[in-house]
Amino acid sequence: DKSVSSTHFSIDIEQLLADGKTIKIKPQGYSMYPLFVPGRDEACIERTDFSSLKRGDVILYRRDKSILVLHRIWKITDNSLYMVGDNQTEIEGPLRADQVRGKLTGFVRNGKFVDVKNPIYRFTSSLWLFLRPLRPCFWKLMSVLRK
């Protein structure tokens, strides 16, 4: 395993994945909050085939001539993906198969590895994906409760 900060994303990370290596990155920003908290969590990613992807998977992909992004699959069509961050409501897409670099296999939180096959993770991530249209209401309620 090689741990690399996502601020240093480069062709090297893409090459490591292409070579079949599992990488660990520390996601930056809050687009995948509450799954990932910047500075706390590490995402474990490995190469994947487009045909093995399913709704709810978190994948690493490259936007056209732009940055690498780690978001969740909202919808899959025959040859396209539609993505959403866990802290977002806007759907991004369509993405092509050639933009996919890898898939989340687990993450490290407070020194402990959590596999994406973990039943609690699967349930909460499926529920959060289902509740996408209600996220703004949820965050508004949380801000009121914190006061």
Q: In which residue ranges do the predicted regions lie?
A:
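Extended hydrophobic leader/signal-anchor segments used for secretion and membrane insertion
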Residues: D1-K147
